[in-house]
Each structure stands twice: as structure tokens, then as C-alpha cells.
Amino acid sequence: MIRSHWRAITLLTLIVVLANAIILSGTFNCDPEILFSGLAVAPQRSFTDACFVDPAVGFLTQALGHLSAQDWLHGIIPWWNPYTGIGMPLAAEVQNESFFLPFVLLLHFHNGWIVQRLLFQIFSGLLTYAFLFLLKLGRPAALLGGALFSLNGTFILTAGTVAGTFLFLPLLLIGIERAHQAALARRPMGWSLIALAIAGSLYAGFPEIAYFDGLLAASWTLLRLAQTPATARWHLLAKIVTGALLGIVLTAPMLIPFLQYLQLGDLGLHGILMAKEISPIAATPLQMLPMFYGALASYSAIAFAWFQIGGWFGCAPVLLALYAVVPKPGAPHRAERTLLACWIVILEARCFGLPGVTALLNLIPGVASTDIIRYAPLSVEFAVFVLAAFGFDDLSRCGPATRGRLAWCAAAFFVCLGLSVIPAWHLLPGWYRTYPALRLPALLSLGGITLTLAATALSLRTGRHLRATQALIITGGVLLFLTSQLGGLRSGHIDRAGIAYLQTNAGLTRFYTLGPFNSNYPAEYRIAAINAVQLPTPENWSNVYNTKLLTPPQSFAYGSTIFMQTAAVRANIAAFEALGVKFIGIPLGGPPLNRILLSTPPPVSVPTTGARGNNYLQMQPGQSVTGTITAPARPASTIYAAAITLGTFKGRSSGPLAISLCAGGQCATGQSDLTLATDNAAFTIRLTPPLPIQPGTALTYRITHAAGPAVALWLSTAQTPMLALQVSATTDQPIRVLHSPAMLIYQLPNPAPYAQASLDACNLVILNRQFMQSNCPQPATLLRRELFYPGWRARVNGTPAAIQPVSGIFQQIPLPAGPATIRFTYMPAHTRLSCAAALLACLIWLLCALAARRHRA
């Protein structure tokens, strides 16, 4: 069977490899670590802004996936992650692919994510081809559908864990079709692929996409049940239910810890804003015209729109899909076409906020708490591409379209195009004035789309040149995929000095970052860091992190500034030390930890001729900003520098930026060239001479951009410049221990040990995070600074010891008098039962598959 399809298999594989040619050749560097870790040195971008939109490919896939792979390769089941937060579940977080064997083992290699994406793309294309061929579409149409799905935009926007679920949607539908055929023929089995697809989609690590794929599969199942004769209907239902139940039981070792984690975790905005969230207006054109703004995956003003669309279809597939929706009389699969069209319309209406649709879909359990506008579009893309394959197959089999059908296609297409483009049309003039370099790629893209549409329309009208049209559509998908890789770096490298320093000196203490060596990346190098970017997050830890460490309280420091969080660290040094934090990293140019920063109130005056956005003030040459600040009631000190958060429009700003400060009749000035500034970061200007201030002194400042291209002053939520004055410290403060090309590392004076006994007379030896030895003159207690979470067990001299919470987040056990050996282990609840159930389900699956094979023989 496979031999007869070797050409299609080869073509689909080559299409995927060609679509990744730039990244495979190393021409541009799309390594997520250099893009997202904050450790890049001298990075130079190429033509566009980014290879991806969602940094989860770095934080989750590359960083935590590598940790999981390392655990497996060392014979450790990756249940627990001691290197993020103060420890938290690893496999239960699911998005890191911990149990997605064997694919997760590829993440042992630094560039394993590339191999993963290639495999996921190839399998997605091949399985879509197989599904369409199973529906009796011709091979050219099946090839077109498989190629389109293997090149879908979601692979670009979210290249990490999300991509692993893609291949299981066509596999699940193949399983349903085989079950349907087996029920009609009264054959046993037929459900094996259903179990495999459901288990794979859950183990792949993204339950939200698996959920919407499951809803589409459930709709397909209802259609097949309605089409099945009554005598075979119960057989079909039994097969599908059997496959679904076995698939769920196969995932029990991961699913049960995940469900427990949902109950004990902080889900952030899920279930609050997700129920009413809709795609922004700027996103409306991107599904049909992904190059509408001249670049893919942009980190500019429209980045949020890219983050909120999930993927795209393109114009030619939409035209073919519309052609398939109204087939000729007697055309096959009319009901299937209607189902897919309804699925597309309903989910598109929900994503873009059509009144009533949101409330209706939220009645379905689970929909209101999922990020539907990002994770439902994959199933919509699949539906569009399947319909496009139907349309192409109609052309191949039935010849050219009638005038009436062609008129319908043209009218419906231009309605869809208008609904996509018109809402965002007003954004274009300002966009291309700000980014004139993007006009050329936008025009080239428009030319390519026009050519492909013309070829498709010609084929619809004449029924000829189908191979050329097919080749043009696939070529357009390949070129679009290659375009995203132009967002890689032409040069630059990762600063590993800080990593090496922490690996040598951190031991069992922890690290905290205000920017560089970003969240979860320390875990890749087995360095414990309290920053965490994952969902869910243990609620007891999240409450402490969000309310006691950050200023103002907020999740993951989103929306805060480096100044605010540096001030929070200074104000809460004792709290950080109590968590075992010894080292803190800040970006170059950021406010130093051993200085106190004074923020400014609203400015006295601002330029009236500069452009003003919601978050920035654009200063033209010769303009100034003035304002006042009052020194706090504290001992006299000296201001020696000012830090201003600037936007340089990707390094285009230049010329001198000056600041003057006056207090008590004395003034100090400073000036620096904007070519030294980092875009969207603090720009420090030293004052000459330093300005002494007294408590309560009124300070007047003036920021002047004398000459050169415009520069943007970032504004706070109060619409004030993000200005901070660095004041010499008068108290014991952190010591700077490393100045590397990418970050500064400070050491806190008194970090708490990882574990300590309640009696000073106890002799405690900490061998590692799980094994310790103690010798106490009398009974005592042991405080272990690891997250208190169900599943932890302790044994003292081989005897179980009860673990009690301390401060809601740490662990405490009793210690006996005399020598004791202490061991901590973690295993989620019901693990033995869930593993036994999964093994039994696997055995049943294998035995039934063998029995069915013998029956066929």
C-alpha cells in the first residue's frame, strides 16, 4: 500500500525540507535561546523581526523539554522540576512534552526543536494526505491538502509544543473512518487508531488544541453515525467509544497529575478573560493576507495581532474551499463539506466576536476557560485545507465550473476578503509611514497572491492547467514559510559567562533575573531560579511570588518595568533571601541593585508637536521634556546618574540625549549619544558633577533631544516618562560579582540555606536536594526550602515522616535525636494505579490489534 504512494510521500517530505531550507542551512540563526533568553550579544537581525511569535518554543520546548529529556536519559522519570520557582511539577505541566516519547528525547540536543518541527510537519502532511485518500479523493487533491496542512502558519507562529498535536487530528479522523468502514463490514476492531490518536494528542502536551480537535472529531463522528444504517450504528458507536476510552486510559500516568495540577494551580487569565476574548481588529486581514503588514511574526506595534490569530489560510485555498462548498449535483461528500463549512463559520464568528456566538459556545464545557482565538484556528485551518482539496478534486474530476458556480465563488471570495481587510485598512497609512522598508515585501507578496489567484480562477473557468495551479499554491506556501526564517539573526552569540559563573557558584541556592537569562532557561542548565513561565503554576507559590516579591502585585511581572521590579527587589531583599536566592541578574544599562531609584511624578510639560502613542512620546530634534520630583525623607545622598527607558525604532535613533537636574540652587548635567542606547531598554546617563540632595528637596529635570532622528520616551500607565534617578546607597546592599557582555550579577548578603535544622546544635549534611544526614542532641525539625506539594514523601532512617507546610510553601519534617539519614521522594498521587491501567490498556490494544490482523489473514 505504501509503495503505491511513494511519489506523494517523497514530494511531501521534500516540500517540508525545502520550506525549512534557510534554517537548516544556518544562513540565519533562529535558535530560540538567542532570541528569547536575554543573553544575546551583538545580535543583528536580518530582514524581518522574528522567526516566531510565541516564545514558548524557547521557555517550554527548548528549556524544560531539554530538562525532561535529560531526566529520561539518566533513568529518572521527569515528575518534578527543582530548578523553576522553588520547585514545581514537571510532567504535570504537560506543555514541556515530558511524556511525549520518543519525540521529547530529541530535545536533549540543543537544536532538537528543529528536527521535531520537521517530523511534525512531515507526519501532518502525510496523515492529511492519507485521510483525503481514504475519502477517495484523487492523489493530486490529496497531495495539495497534505502540503497545505504541513505548511500551515501555526507551525511558524508557535513552533514549540503546540506543533506536536497537529499530526493527531488527521490521524484521529482516519481512525473514525476506519471504524466506520469496519462497522459497515461487521469487522472486529477498526478503533485502534482512535486510541493512538487520542493518546498521542494528549501526550503531545497541548490539551487546548487537543480539545478543539476532539470537538471537530466528535462532530465528524455524529455525522458518520447519522449516515450509518441502524443495524451498524451501535457497532460504530461501540468502536469509537472503545477507542476513545482506551486512548484516555493510555494517558492516565500524565492525565491524573495534570488534572490535580489544574485544581492546585494558578491558571492566570483562563476562565476569566478567555470567555470573552476576541481577536483584535489588526488581526482580521492576517488569515487571508499574512503579509498584509509586510512581515511575518512581527515584534512591532502589531505583535499582539500576530499573537492572537493562531494561523492563516491564504487566498487561493479559501477560493478553492468556497468552490467546494457548493458542489455540482451528485458530487460526493456533500454532508462532509457542509459540516466543515459550518465549523469554519462558527469558530471564525467566535474568534472575531459575532454577537451571540460567544455565549452559545461558552455553554460547551471547557470552552470558556480555553484560549479559543489562538488554539481553535488550527482545526479551522485543517477544515479550510480539506475543503480546498475537495474543490481541487472537483476540478480534476468534473471539469470547469459553471458560470453560476464561478459567480458564487467570486462573490463569496470578495465578501470574505472585504470582511478581512476593511476593518484594518485604516491602519495601513500610518504603518507604512513608520516602516517604509516593509512596502516592497508587501507588494511582492501581493503580486504572488494575485498570480496564484489568477491561475486558480483560470483553472476554475477552464478546468485546465491544474498541475500548474497546484504547483503555484504549494510554492506560495513554501515561500511564505521561508519568509518567516528571514527573521533569524545574521550574527550574534550567547553570553555564557553568567551561566558558567552560576553553575560554579550557585550550588543549592537560587537565582532571580530581572531580564537576562530568562525564565525557565536556567532549568536547561540545572540552575535553580525562582522565575517561572508556565501554566498552570502552583497556587501557593504563585500567591507568594505575585504578592510579596513584585511591585505592584502581578503575575510574571507582565506590564511592569525594570525600574519597578528593581525597586521591589531592594524593598524585599529579606524575602528573596528567605527563598534561598543568592544571585540576581539584571540587564546591562538597567538600574543597579546597590542603588536606590527615585521615580518621577507627571511631567510639567511635554512636546506638543511630537507623535504621542498610548505608551510612548516621540521626541523630535530640539524638543525637551521637563518635570519635578521630590526627594524622599531619608538621609542626605547623592544622585550620580539617570536612567531613561527609550525606544530607538530598532536602532534608528541617533544624536545626543541630554538631561539636567537642579536642586537647592545646584545643577548637574549629563549627555550621551543615542547610538549607544538599546531599543526598548533603560539608557543610563551619568551626571557631572554628581548632585547632592537633602531630604524632601524638590528636583527639576529636563530631558533634551538636541539633534538626529526621533527617539521615543516610554511612558508609564500614568502617561509619565519612565525616568529613574540613581542615588548612592547608605545601607548594606547586594554586591556586584559579575559584569558579563549580557548581564550583571549581584550577590545577596544572607541567602537562606536550602535546608536547616531548628537546633543550631544539629549537625546537618546536605548531600543533594533529596538526600541529607543529621545528628541532633535532641529531637528537632528540618526545614526544607522546596515547594510543599502533594506527592512529596520523606523517610527518616527508613521510616516514613510526615511532611508539614511552613509558610504555606516550604516543607518541614521531624528529626530524631542522634544520627539520621533523610530521603525525600516525589511521585504524583495514584501513579501506580494509573501506570497499571495504562499498561493494561496498552496490552488490550496490542492483543486486539493482533487478533484483528489474524482475522484479516
Where do the language-model regions lie?
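Hydrophobic alpha-helical membrane-insertion signals
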Residues: 2-89, 259-265, 488-525, 531
